[in-house]
Regions:
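C-terminal helical "tail/cap" subdomain of flavin- and related membrane-associated enzymes
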Residues: 276-366
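Glycine-rich FAD pyrophosphate-binding loop
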Residues: 3-17
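Conserved N-terminal helical subregion
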Residues: 24-142, 351-358
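N-terminal capping/small domains of soluble enzymes
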Residues: 363-474, 481-483, 526, 534
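Conserved mid-domain beta->alpha element of the FAD-binding
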Residues: 112-113, 143, 227-308, 312
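Conserved FAD-binding catalytic core of PHBH/FMO-like flavoproteins
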Residues: 81, 103-233
């Protein structure tokens, strides 16, 4: 039987923040690992289904999101009680010398560093843990309120004379909610939050969001020894979680932005995995390696979504200019974990309303039923596209002397009949010396122009597709083999090549031919080639030139 000891620098119940948000999947993991503590949590969980988006008093609600929450202090108490039942020794208000843990605990088989986003264990040896810490620019503060927001996770934006403030609010017990206030660096400075006490900050925020608080105050937990004043979010990513018999878990190893509510989830699932490996793998060193290998991918996946979310909040100036409906849609899909069709599963009525709004807003026409945004027509200057699908340029390297032939006729004809509204050609070169390979298409003579006109004419006669041509010049990448004739990318031709030019005499790759530094007269010649090719593209009937 192992002796298990926990050393906590804080008093029992001291915690950073107010409530914790879980997903149903996290609870399933907890139930499978320890049904006793999971049941106690489950008995006290607050459930909600909606997300409310509020901007300057305007409200948009969507459903089907399925959140659950619990108070951090209550969660800790449940875990304390269960740990004691299982014989774990809990030591509170116990500072540990993190500079040499193995010397301080010489008999320990494993030392678990769960000391959070400001982990001293990690910070003492950032190089060993291969740790990147990226301090993000926005500021936020953890507050609480007796206003319950009892049926929705609520996002609120208010524009003030000092800039935008916004809130992430959610209920975590029967009469209390977390109330996180966030802003950008300039708004933080404009308000003077840096010179305010925690209580003064809370009162300032209360006045801004008074209409949503139902007469309740904003609460602080300033008795906590670390405080919870305005801070920047540190994005922590460790590529190594192990040093000797010391192992990182939770925020010490990786952080996920609070806007997707997954920090505690990651920590709990780390702990479950670590306990399982220590229990089932005889060699402790291998157990730690297996733990990191199992958890690292999941953590990276969630961190990627969290990065998308935090970046969205950092770029709000862009999104707050959107129509309110579009803003709400952007908010819901910001992490890229929730797709358009996933929103349909969550709240079909809401999404269909959004689709109908989008189609009418984009076209100025009324629609009896919703249309998926992909199939809404699009107008670019005088060019009208029947939908928003585009076939991007793809070099095929199948021409001779730059001439598109029957192969290209079939290829582009099939793409045009495939349903995309806009079909791009491959990069088509403006002169023979502008080609990447001998197989590249061109548009520098009449024969090529007529061949392209045949392809464009077919697309216009038999499909709704518009045709766009991509004109280009290879520069230092020119005079190279076709991809299937070489083991290397862009390998120079052995014979039959041509002189290549570039802005400077620097090879494209270390094995490439050295280009000639282009002269002013040659620049003018290249410019004239582009002008000539553009005129030929227009004469061939192309709808668009890139």
């Amino acid at each position: 039987m192992y002796k298990r000891q926990v050393y906590e620098r804080n008093k029992p119940g001291d915690t950073f923040g107010w409530g914790v948000v879980f997903s149903d999947q996290t609870m399933e993991n907890l139930i499978a690992n320890d049904p006793v503590s999971a049941q106690k949590m489950n008995d006290e969980l607050i459930h909600w289904d909606y997300i409310d988006t509020i901007v300057n008093g305007e409200v948009d609600r969507s459903g089907g999101h399925g959140f659950i929450g619990i108070g951090r202090k209550r969660l800790l108490q449940i875990l304390y009680d269960r740990a004691r039942e299982l014989g774990v020794e809990l030591n509170f208000e116990s500072e540990v010398n993190t500079e040499n843990l193995p010397a301080q605990f010489p008999d320990a088989d494993v030392i678990v560093a769960a000391d959070g986003l400001n982990s001293r264990v990690r910070n003492n040896d950032l190089e060993h843990f291969k740790c990147d810490i990226d301090m993000r620019p926005n500021r936020f503060v953890w507050l609480g309120t007796k206003q319950t927001f009892d049926d929705a996770f609520t996002f609120i934006w208010e524009k003030t004379e000092h800039g935008w403030l916004w809130v992430h609010a959610y209920q975590f017990d029967k009469d209390t909610s977390t109330f996180i206030v966030e802003c950008d660096a300039q708004t933080y400075e404009n308000f003077g939050f840096d010179s305010m006490s925690h209580e003064e900050s809370a009162e300032t925020c209360r006045k801004v969001f008074e209409q949503y608080l139902g007469g309740h105050e904003l609460l602080t937990n300033s008795a906590h020894i670390r405080g919870s004043a305005w801070i920047n979010f540190p994005r922590v990513l460790c590529h190594n979680w192990i040093k000797d018999n010391v192992v990182l878990i939770g925020d010490a190893a990786h952080t996920a932005h609070f806007s997707i509510g997954s920090g505690t989830k990651l920590a709990l699932e780390d702990a479950i995995s670590l306990a399982d490996k220590l229990d089932t793998v005889a060699d402790k060193k291998q157990a730690l390696l297996d733990y990191q290998n199992e958890r690292e991918i999941d953590a990276l996946r969630l961190q990627s979504s969290a990065r998308n979310s935090l970046t969205w909040f950092e770029q709000l100036d862009r999104y707050l200019k959107f129509d309110f409906k579009q803003f709400s849609y952007s908010l819901l899909t910001r992490s890229q974990r929730v797709s358009h069709e996933n929103l349909r599963l969550r709240d079909q009525k809401w999404l269909e309303g959004m689709e109908k709004w989008f189609a009418e807003n984009a076209t100025g026409k009324k629609f009896d039923k919703p249309i998926a945004p992909m199939f809404v027509p699009y107008k670019l200057r005088a060019m009208e596209l029947v939908n928003r699908m585009v076939v991007s340029p793809m070099s095929m390297y199948s021409a001779e002397n730059g001439l598109p032939d029957d192969w290209h006729f079939v290829h582009y004809g099939a793409l045009a009949k495939g349903g995309a509204a806009l079909v791009y050609t491959e990069m088509t070169d403006v002169s023979a010396d502008a080609r990447i390979t001998p197989g590249c298409t061109g548009l520098w003579n009449d024969e090529q122009q007529h061949a392209w006109a045949r392809i464009v004419g077919f697309a216009h006669k038999h499909t709704n597709a518009k045709m766009a041509i991509q004109l280009g010049h290879a520069g230092p990448k020119g005079s190279t083999k076709k991809p299937w004739d070489s083991k290397m990318s862009d390998e120079p031709l052995d014979e039959g090549g041509w002189e290549i030019v570039s802005a400077s005499a620097v090879p494209f790759a270390d094995y490439s031919d050295t280009p000639k530094e282009i002269s002013r007269d040659e620049m003018q010649s290249v410019l004239e080639d582009f002008v000539s090719a553009t005129k030929r593209a227009d004469a061939a009937g192309f709808d668009m030139v890139k």
